[in-house]
Swiss-Prot record:
Disulfide bond residue pairs: none
Gene from which this protein is expressed: fadD15
InterPro entries linked: AMP-bd_C_sf, AMP-binding_CS, AMP-dep_synth/lig_dom, ANL_N_sf
The species this protein was found in: Mycobacterium bovis (strain ATCC BAA-935 / AF2122/97)
Record GO terms (molecular function): ATP binding; long-chain fatty acid-CoA ligase activity
Protein name: Long-chain-fatty-acid--CoA ligase FadD15
UniProt entry keywords in alphabetical sequence: ATP-binding, Fatty acid metabolism, Ligase, Lipid metabolism, Nucleotide-binding
Any one GO biological process: fatty acid biosynthetic process
């Protein structure tokens, strides 16, 4: 199958917009708890009426600052409650939200401010505010900087005070003037291959995304469910899911404190979470390592295989009597503990940003947590394809979100069009023209659609490795397999214009400690100290051999190199959503790559 379309069971009207739902909820269900926010470490209820009042006050404050419809307003902050309130306020006055990751460098912030010509910026912390102040001479359009937290006056309080003298009728008029074709947000791409481009999304794009998600997931996105958002709201996935949840009256909480995520999950008790595959891989690998450290590695291995078998059997008419009995035993011994780590009530998750892997998907479903994989980009308002609760094929990213179409080009590239697809790049006609072909957006990803209409992503077009022998290799297949090993943190497949495929491997710091203990290694030894240790080499070699089973002999990894350090966002090898920056890795570890191909 080369093309598939899914019609929308809804319409988007001329004046439909994202902010309208804030005041609809206030009118229809004022006392319902739509948010919970952390105040002094306690999750505190926020009703629809309270949220609407805060958003209204912030919007009036923006009007008092002279923010006009179409003006760009930056949120430079980690994920937190105020992020969502400010976003809705910006949209309500007809302005355009411009997110910046809280980890961005001064040069990245400068470029976004200069290119977008933002007039107001919300800085989260003292350090964010200081960075922006130091850039003030090079960003003349920026008139106002307000601080969300830290030592400065609170941004929401300042807006409330400033907007007290503004007639509420002015906000009513702004809302009435909004059209679905109006710009809503400007999201800057990661810029791994040059200057970041501003991706323009309209109110219509976001409304299509929100309504499409609800159409596919009426049992996840419904009143009474609970969602804890911990991915960066600057990333389109977290923001789109948060908006869809708000629309469906899911109670939403926010945190950026990843180090204390498990205790927060235990208290918040979400029924659904949204994350990237690396988090699900990490949870699995940690559970496997903890079992191994406790001398129960064999039990966990059998439990994991039973979960996979049970899930696969569900796709073939259901598990038999013996498998059901085994599954029940391991549910008490293993799976229940895994669910408890996520708060005890979590029954489903949404995964996006990278492929999850079929085995991991089956494991989690078998353990009682169904993961619905999706696919999308900033240019598609988040998900353009997603697995459905009643139409799931693990290992795929599902079917098009209603109102959208997918096509596989002759060279295997995935093309998309429809309600969620963006209108173009900000002030960059050349890039916009290059991004489309006959009205279809060129995603840059390689994919396939099976006979049932399910989409599978096989890699990035620009990441395809062409060996010296002319063999095309998609690195993601091997890398996903390698990251499934509990001792491996990251893997980068190399071999462009080389005689064979190689790999750079980093070791998971937490798993490494347990491995040293089980293998009688010196407690204080670092990965660098043991990078050539025969036992460590043997363990990674076994993982490489297992990964190679997923590809042909010509595509298989012949040699690998263990790096002395792991990749992190702080050291520059990872994006805020934990994707590897291949160009950075290739430059930083050029000598290690060369060593793979040096003749011994």
């Amino acid at each position: 199958m080369r093309e598939i379309s899914v019609p929308a069971p809804f319409t988007v009207g001329e004046h439909d917009n994202v902010a309208a739902m804030v005041f609809e909820h206030e009118r229809d269900d004022p006392d319902y708890v739509i948010y919970q926010r952390l105040i002094d470490g306690v999750w505190t209820d926020v009703t629809c009426a309270e949220a609407a009042n805060q958003i209204r006050a912030a919007a009036l404050g923006l009007i008092s600052l002279g923010v006009q419809a179409g003006d760009r307003v930056v949120i430079f902050s980690a994920t937190r409650y105020e992020w969502a309130i400010l976003d809705f306020a910006i949209l309500a006055v007809g302005a355009v939200t411009v997110p910046i990751y809280e980890t961005s460098s001064a040069e990245q912030v400068r470029w976004v401010l200069q290119d977008s010509e933002a007039v107001v910026l919300f800085a989260e912390t003292d350090s964010h505010a200081t960075m922006v102040a130091e850039l003030s001479g090079s960003v003349p359009a920026l008139r106002e900087v307000l601080q969300i937290a830290g030592s400065g006056p609170n941004a929401l309080d300042r807006l409330t005070e400033a907007g007290a003298s503004v007639d509420p009728a002015e906000l009513t008029a702004r809302l009435a003037a909004l059209r679905s074709t109006d710009p809503a947000t400007l999201i800057y791409t990661s810029g791994t291959t040059g200057r970041p481009k501003g991706c323009q999304l309209t109110q219509s794009n976001l409304v299509h995304e929100i309504k499409g998600a609800r159409a596919y997931h009426p049992t996840l996105l419904r009143k009474g469910e609970r969602l804890l958002v911990f991915l960066p709201l600057a990333h389109v996935l977290a923001r789109a899911i948060s908006m869809a949840a708000f629309h469906s009256k899911v109670t939403v909480g926010f945190t950026s404190d990843i180090k204390n995520l498990l205790p927060m999950l235990a208290v918040f008790k979400p029924t659904v979470v949204v994350s990237v595959p690396r988090v699900f891989e990490k949870v699995y690998n940690t559970a496997e390592q903890n079992a191994a450290n406790a001398g129960k590695g064999r039990i966990f291995a059998i439990a994991a295989q039973t979960a996979v078998d049970w899930s696969e059997a569900c796709d073939r008419g259901g598990p038999g009597l013996l498998l059901r009995a085994k599954h029940a035993v391991f549910d008490r011994l293993v799976y229940r503990k895994l669910r408890a780590a996520l708060g005890g009530n979590c029954r489903a998750a949404v995964s996006g940003g990278a492929p999850l892997g079929a085995r991991l998907g089956h494991f989690y479903r078998g353990a009682g947590l169904t993961i619905y994989e999706g696919y999308g980009l900033s240019e598609t308002s988040g998900g353009v394809a997603i697995s459905q609760f009643n139409d799931l094929k693990i290992g795929t990213v599902g079917k098009p979100v209603p109102g959208n179409s997918l096509r596989i080009a002759d060279d295997g590239e995935l093309l998309v069009r429809g309600g969620v697809v963006f209108s173009g790049y900000w002030r960059n006609e050349q890039a916009t023209t290059e991004a489309f072909t006959d009205g279809w957006f060129k995603t840059g990803d390689l994919g396939a659609v099976d006979e049932d209409g399910f989409l599978t992503i096989t890699g990035r077009k620009k990441e395809i490795i062409v060996t010296a022998g002319g063999k095309n290799v998609a690195p993601a297949v091997l890398e996903d397999q390698l990251r499934a090993h509990p001792l491996i943190s990251q893997a980068v497949v190399v071999g462009d214009a080389k005689p064979f495929i190689g790999a750079l491997i980093t070791i998971d710091p937490e798993a490494f400690e347990g491995w040293k203990q089980r293998n009688s290694k010196t407690a204080g030894a670092s990965v660098g100290d043991l990078a050539t240790d025969p036992d460590l080499i043997a363990e990674i070699d076994a993982a490489v051999k297992q990964a190679n089973l997923a590809v042909s002999h010509a595509e298989s990894i012949r040699k690998f190199r263990i790096l002395p350090v792991d990749f992190t966002e702080d050291t520059g090898e990872l994006t805020p959503t934990m994707k590897v920056k291949r160009k950075v890795v290739a430059e930083k570890f050029a000598s290690d790559i060369e060593a793979i191909y040096n003749k011994e």
